[in-house]
Design a protein with these regions (language model features):
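Fungal secretory targeting signals
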Residues: 1-19, 23
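Beta-strand-rich N-terminal accessory domains
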Residues: 20-78, 232-259, 306-321
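Beta-strand/loop-rich accessory regions of lumenal/periplasmic or secreted enzymes
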Residues: 73-98, 186-203, 296
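Extended, loop-rich substrate-binding clefts of extracytoplasmic carbohydrate-active enzymes
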Residues: 93-148
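Signature of Gram-negative chaperone-usher
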Residues: 101, 105-107, 118-122, 244-292, ...
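Acidic, contiguous internal or C-terminal segments within carbohydrate-active enzymes
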Residues: 126-167, 171, 178
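Active-site/ligand-binding surface loops and adjacent short beta/alpha elements
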Residues: 164-166, 174-263
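Intrinsically disordered, low-complexity Pro/Gly/Ser/Thr-rich segments with frequent PxxP/GP/PP motifs
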Residues: 296-309
């Protein structure tokens, strides 16, 4: 038997969320000798910000000014960790319980030289609340590494259950954009990839070399290439290119580290959808685009005793003219 999502009542979800409330969200701040910095909430092991050495005043990540910060509801912006479900699943919080759980800070060490990263590691594991929704045993580890102009994150799912499990996993990057209109941001690297358009509810193949935005976009690209780029035109900042490199793998006893396929989600709610979101400003769609690596087109299977790793590197550089 493979244990996938078990649909329970929403009352269990409410009980989980109600137990997590906090007056103020605790964070850990990473700093690097080159001048970069990043901040991560314990709640959701949620990366809040990433300021690169090339421009310490610039946040690579978008954070909504309307976001909930109550330690109960999910945070809108940064890098939410989506697990074990992508989107809606009966009896589960939207995008899973990982992003609305207080994780444990396992370790934190800032770099003492420019060659090495500053690192924070977080953990969470199955609890009575998660078992009520999903009756399996697991442990999650999330590692955040800060370099001068790179942020590396890795989500590790350890199957400590006696049987195989299945899940979705996604790193929901919100990138800061000066102005998403008029080709102010262009995403590339997905031409020829099959995708599901969640707005039109149709399957299609990407024909564009460059994806620009003029309306609501919510595409799930299956088995996407491992390198994606977002070229962002500066308004009060330099023109810049954000590169996302992603990878998935399974390791453990009897496994030498098998590479797995990963997907990519590209999302912008645009004007009408933005107005319908309580935790998102009406005009904030102009200042973000989400480019999200993960495994969500199908559920990721993980044998007992094995570990699944989803990792990404977000790097930033001035756009070459």
């Amino acid at each position: 038997m493979v244990f996938s999502f078990v649909f329970k009542t929403t009352a269990l979800v409410s009980a989980l969320l109600a137990s997590l409330g906090a007056a103020e969200l605790e964070t850990v701040k990473l700093t690097h000798p080159d001048g970069s910095s990043a901040e991560v909430y314990h709640f959701g092991a949620h990366v809040k910000s990433f300021h690169p050495a090339m421009d310490p005043k610039l946040d690579v990540l978008f954070m909504s000014k309307e976001s909930n910060m109550d330690g109960v509801n999910p945070i809108r912006g940064g890098i939410p960790v989506v697990f074990p479900n992508f989107g809606s699943a009966k009896g589960f919080p939207s995008h899973g319980f990982a992003r609305v759980t207080n994780w444990t800070l396992a370790s934190h060490k800032d770099a003492t030289d420019k060659k090495n990263p500053s690192v924070a590691k977080f953990t969470m594991a199955a609890s009575n609340s998660t078992r009520a929704m999903w009756p399996v045993e697991f442990k999650l580890e999330y590692e955040v590494k800060l370099y001068a102009n790179e942020l590396k994150t890795a989500l590790r799912v350890h199957n400590t259950f006696s049987q195989p499990i299945e899940f979705h996993a996604l790193l929901h990057n919100y990138l800061w954009v000066d102005d998403a209109t008029n080709k102010g941001v262009q995403v590339s690297g997905l031409k020829g990839v099959e995708y599901f358009d969640k707005v039109a509810k149709v399957n299609a193949t990407e024909t564009r070399d460059i994806i620009a935005f003029a309306n609501q976009t919510d595409n799930v690209y299956s088995n996407a290439p491992n390198t994606l780029k977002a070229v962002i035109k500066g308004v009060n900042a330099v023109d810049r290119t954000v590169t996302i490199k992603k990878a998935g793998s399974i390791s453990g006893p009897g496994s030498k580290g098998v590479k797995t396929e990963t997907d990519a989600v590209v999302w912008n709610p645009w004007a009408d959808r933005a107005k319908a979101m309580d935790d998102f400003g009406d005009e904030e769609y102009k200042n973000m685009v989400a480019v999200e690596p993960g495994r969500v087109s199908v559920k990721q299977a993980l044998p007992a005793g094995q570990t699944y790793t989803l990792q990404e590197t977000i790097s930033i550089a001035k756009t070459k003219q």
